[in-house]
A protein has these predicted regions:
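A charged, well-structured terminal subsegment
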Residues: 27-65
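Thiamine diphosphate
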Residues: 1-3, 9, 188
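Active-site-proximal loop->helix
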Residues: 5-20
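Short acidic, glycine/tyrosine-flanked loop/strand segments centered on an H-E-D-like triad
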Residues: 17-25, 211-212
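Short, ordered loop/turn segments at secondary-structure junctions
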Residues: 2-6, 27-31, 207, 342
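Non-transmembrane, aqueous-exposed alpha-helical and coiled segments at domain scale
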Residues: 79-435
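A short, charged, Gly/Pro-tolerant segment at domain boundaries
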Residues: 57-80
Length: 435
């Protein structure tokens, strides 16, 4: 059963599960937070249909619902994610397409195989160049990518990398990213289908940041770096073409975020006063190159040009972290703090360790009582009761343990940092990049 607005998602999910004829009872949208009388009316109106779906001939129902197409309300006129999809198990290895760049892009766009921007045609020559002589098995299965359970083989990852504009030396990063995407802690099925405006952030650490020129300094989350832009876009291409995250079908983000095009940057170890990256904090060696994937929103800037002490800067950061509209406020989960080098240096000079920073934020970063609505309190009591403060204040903590806060140093000069909230019901995953 699902609401009419999300019938397309329900239909696509039945296909993902290998049951394209699974009957779906439809109720009017929206259904969230209806009063009991409204729920009763909807139930009365749908009960006959539910009985029919339970009792009618199973084969006839399968045939009926296999052919029943979802209404298309979006202006995006993509083909079905399962029609002519080059990542389907029975898809041909090669597609004979137009000879000109514009024609290829029109074809790929019409089939829903792009992010909307022009792609590099994945010709056999470009594919072979991407694979190189690394000894990789093109048929090796790296992961199954949710929600479509698409098979992310080395070959498919390489093809999507070509399309995104990646260079051959970016492929090991994409291979590691594909493995991380398949980890259950990331909860990719939710990230790739939710109405929340989240994306997959890729944080690159270790020697490879210099080897392939990953930007770790000025404009670190912005445009200008081929490695950052192309690797992040390659991950999005994998989520779309292998995972099935087609906007308006399985990807049901209400607003979305520009970070869904590409969100990839590197840790700035050279200007990290603690000499420890997030990857090292997670148990990896300084000599290892890694990629950490996180399910996040876009970054929220922290502008503090006037704080002279660690506590003054951390107070500003605390306030930025504490918005009642964040998923972290009522689902818990991780939240990332990316300290600009100047903020990091001031905090470090005041004697704060990374653990001290986390302790400060746990104690001082809380959502004030007056901005929490009663429905929000109800949800928080249900999901994160440990975050609610004593009745005297009535506010709520944004973090309760060190594991809730990820500390990163990145960016260039200037008194700015960034808070990056997460989807909440997700955990970061780190994979070693093997050249």
């Amino acid at each position: 059963m699902c609401s009419d607005e999300f019938y397309a998602l329900g239909k696509a999910e039945t296909q993902c599960l290998g049951m394209p004829g699974l009957p779906i009872a439809v109720v009017p949208h929206p259904v969230a937070k209806l009063v009991p009388d409204e729920v009763a009316t909807i139930a009365r109106n749908v009960v006959d249909e539910v009985i029919r779906l339970w009792q009618d001939d199973a084969e006839a129902l399968r045939a009926e619902f296999k052919e029943k197409a979802p209404p298309t309300k979006s202006r995006l006129r993509y083909r079905s994610m399962f029609e002519g999809n080059f990542s389907a198990p029975d898809a041909p290895e090669r597609l004979n397409g137009p000879d000109d760049l514009e024609g290829v892009n029109r074809l790929f766009y019409s089939r829903g195989w792009t992010d909307g921007l022009p792609i590099i045609p994945p010709t056999p020559e470009r594919y072979e160049k991407m694979l190189g002589n690394r000894g990789l098995d093109p048929n090796e299965l790296l992961a199954r990518i949710e929600p479509r359970q698409g098979e992310a083989t080395v070959a498919k990852v390489a093809v999507n990398g070509v399309m995104a504009g990646c260079q051959p030396d970016h492929l090991p990063v994409l291979v590691a990213a594909a493995k991380a995407l398949g980890h259950s802690d990331l909860n990719l099925k939710a990230l790739n289908t939710t109405t929340h405006p989240c994306t997959v952030l890729a944080l690159i650490s270790g020697p490879i940041t210099e080897n392939i020129d990953v930007n770790t300094t000025y404009n670190v989350m912005g445009q200008g770096s081929l490695a950052n832009a192309a690797i992040g876009r390659g991950i999005r291409s994998i989520l779309l073409n292998i995972g099935g995250g087609t906007p308006g079908i399985l990807d049901r983000a209400t607003m979305g975020t520009p970070a869904k095009y590409s969100f990839c940057f590197g840790e700035n170890l050279a200007e990290n006063p603690w000499g420890e990256t997030l990857a090292m904090e997670r148990g990896f060696g300084a000599e290892q190159s890694t990629i950490t994937l996180c399910g996040v929103e876009g970054p929220h800037n922290v502008n503090d040009h006037y704080g002279k002490t660690a506590e003054e800067i951390l107070q500003t950061i605390s306030g930025t972290m504490c918005s009642p509209g964040l998923n972290n406020s009522y689902l818990g989960g991780e939240i990332m703090l990316v300290l600009g080098p100047e903020h990091a240096e001031i905090i470090h000079k005041d004697g704060f360790s990374k653990a001290d920073i986390k302790n400060y934020l746990i104690e001082n970063a809380f959502i004030p009582a007056h901005v929490l609505s009663e429905p929000q309190r109800v949800i928080m009591r249900q999901y994160v009761p440990e975050r609610l403060l004593a009745d005297g204040d009535g506010g709520a903590k944004i973090a309760t343990s060190h594991d809730d806060i990820q500390l990163v140093v990145a960016g260039g000069a200037g008194r700015h940092s960034a808070v990056i909230p997460s989807f909440g019901n997700t955990r970061a995953v780190t994979e070693v990049i093997r050249s």
